[in-house]
């Protein structure tokens, strides 16, 4: 092994590792090495390359990389292919902005070939930047052999998927009200529409509809979408609700509205008189005068009539709903049910009064060409209604309203002709297949996703757009003959034309002769919703079923996928719909859902606000490993939100990587020292490690096996949120406990044999944790491994730590008894440190006594066997271990009020005061049995928490404790203890200066100190042996200050006025 430098630049070392991986083709080699092993299939959800990767992408990528690296290290062959989403609105929207495209006419004027070529030119706009980020984060994935949704083989498989659904009668053409994006001039699926809500202020109007049979009577309706009033065809009441006819005293008008809805207009019932009370059924069939004249002739087709619908309630509005079937889902359904419209009336003008751009058509003469959601349009409609005497009341309402996820413009609901996949008919299968999958965290599957599936509606998969996979439907002019094409070969067979590209410009002109004498069949204009393409990814990335048929069928469904919580209604959903429709199987077996990464202020990360640091700038400062560990050691891996803090990433260096590095460096340093001192070569031998009788050796080795067993079990359950904290805690145990408590042994203070045993233990643990942490922190583990492996025989050395299989636990090294004992020792030491901190007694100053009180005899026996460590760590002279709780401890109980209140209801008030009166004897018995009866109610350890309090004086003592033990620190200080504290602080300053000067323990130097303080000089003389034993040098007193030939000198203040100068001279 080679010497390790004193300091490390983590980011700099990572850059060297990247070059090394590139040189040895590490990823490619690892995949090749694992050929023939059991397959572990993984699907990578395709991102768009039109935007730069952000922390959400980095998080998901890190989770994917960690799991797939672990799968490789546990003996699997893991194909990892990157994918790109290339089609759809995100691409088209960029082109529309770039070229000023607003309407369909603009596209046709430009020409679809030119428009699509523009789209193609930006699809991979940031692919290079993506590759840089993915590579820099240490993610191993094949970005060269990627899949793209715009590639012909992928698109051909999408055609096959659609044809299969058509064969199963799961495809139909319909007329349906859908969320519609004015900004992108296309309908959206329900899951797209639910992804971007904003609180907005909209007009809320009460308007009156004059009844046809009595011009003095008007029916009142309430709406927040006055732009839909020109398309009104019905008024809907609830047949079971009560309604009233009233005389408005101030307005001198007669209105009909819900009996319980008068508050929408009136503050007092003195403002009106009730003329008649009626049921909703009494109103059904009543006709009224159209509010606008544009579609008055629709009265002859069953329009402008009161109808019944159960969705009407009396908790808002007037209890009567203005119904425009073309612009509301409930409106559409209730009008269908009541025969006001039918599904085949695609071209009825009143159902098409708003064009594709969100503007009124020429039929709506007063507002033709006006954008329906513009404020000016609302104003003009309001003026019209007031002039006609139909505006009864108007106000503004703040409510949550859907916006287009891509153009960020308000959506409208609009009836459109579309091609649908039947989802409602396979809901039960979707739920059954969802039950076969395993999600982390489980609540997302059981609650959020399952609830979404229960209410899933038929999926509109067609988009009247241009850059996408064309829907392969060729239809006769009368719509009677429909041909669905499932492959390029089939298209050639039926049309006589062979194509190599499947985009619109390549196939729109192709016609198919009718086989039923209906002339020529032409392709419909629509393309697929891009979610249909990404949902087809398991099949299309393999060009299934045209290629890789056997391969696909062996690895489907995927073992693992991972994406963000937002994909619950996106990719996770479309994957499940298509796999269920095609094969009645779930598309994946295991899924990790990550939460959202927010800015430090809890707001969404925004380029405009610049409220987050650039990811690559963070990585350039502290390295990718720190960012990886920060992200996957946070609640975000269990679908919770993370407020990103750059300090949190930096803390990973301070709290994890630097201590880990220092432990590794300390090992190498002392290994090389041992080799030099013994003139031997260190060769790690697990037998030597296992033979060690040292309790700390047994503990760290046992802990290491427990860790490996735990990681294997939890990784099998995909619980990163339990695994990573455990790994980090182990590194703390290794660095802050094992290494620190065994420094002298590792330096050889107990002889060569003991030193060799300690070095073997430390090597074994460092190498094990190095391999185990490989999937999580791939750079630093590689850095360490490249040096640590040099101690191994050549045949056991691998080119990369990531080629080494994940460790198996060593069964004979397990020792839960020792693990428990050391854990108890740690608790006691931490309680003692906390007591020192509270009373401002630094650890450098010795204290007289420390008492531990517990009735648990095994606990005391464990501490007795380890008391030398406790004495040293707490810097105390004596430890007292006693089970005499009666003399020192007052025991009380504290109730879990929330738990007991919910369970005991009214009896809790009677029981609560009795809990506080329980005696020491009762509570000690409760501790043994874990149960106690109070007024007939059995209380357990989950209901009561035991509190131990010290009953002695606390002027010169400081108690601490938990549910098991109580500790008391004696704060009395005598002169001998005070002097030892001074000596200890001087040692600390000498060691710091030695480190600062770059000295090792073997360097030939002399150490001196000079002081005029008699108190300090006496303290040093009285503790000379202790000082020499610790620093391994004789610290000599000098009558004078440091001479000119001293190469390191420092004036230090030991305590208060006790100053000293320490310096080193070369021998």
Swiss-Prot record:
It comes from the Eukaryota. This is Probable isoleucine--tRNA ligase, cytoplasmic. It comes from Dictyostelium discoideum. Keywords: Aminoacyl-tRNA synthetase, ATP-binding, Cytoplasm, Ligase, Nucleotide-binding, Protein biosynthesis. One of its GO terms (biological process) is isoleucyl-tRNA aminoacylation. Gene3D superfamilies: HUPs, Isoleucyl-tRNA Synthetase, Domain 1. It is an enzyme of class 6 (ligase). Its main location: cytoplasm. ATP binds at residue 607.
